[in-house]
Amino acid sequence: MFRGLAQTMGFGSYVAACAEVSVSDAGELTVHRIVAATDPGHAVNPQQIEAQVEGSFVYGLSAALYGEITLKDGRIEQSNFHDYPVLHMDEMPAVEAIVMPSGGFWGGVGEPTIAVAAPAVLNAIFAATGQRIRELPLKHHSLKKA
C-alpha cells in the first residue's frame, strides 16, 4: 500500500487529501482509500459537506482514470453520460471526509475536492512505481514499476 498527498486552496476552502493505492506486478491500479480534510470556513451541515466531498471524489477520480473527450470524423464521440466513462460503484475507494471548519470565509466544498483527487493518486502511484505521470487519463499509461 502506498500513499500520496495533495492539497489546495480554492473557492474559499482549504482541502488536503491522502490516497492509498496499490499497483500489481501487471501494472493494475487499485485505489483503496482516500482521506480528505476540508476547511470550508463554516459548516452549517457537516453531513452534507461529507456527502459532497465523497461525490466530488467520484468525479475527480473518474476524470483521472478515464476522462477524455475523443474526436472521430471531426465530431466529439461522447454525447452524454451513457458513453462517457465514469467510476463504477465497485471501483470506488473508501472515502473518509473530515470537516474542519475554522470559522473563516464561507467556502465551497465540492470543487476544491475535485482538484486534489488526481494529484493525490498520482503521488501515490509515484511512491508505488517511481513513475511521474504528467498526462491524464491514467488508462493510457503502463503502471509497471520503473
Locate the predicted segments by residue.
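Cofactor-binding beta-sheet edge motifs in enzyme active sites
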Residues: 1-146
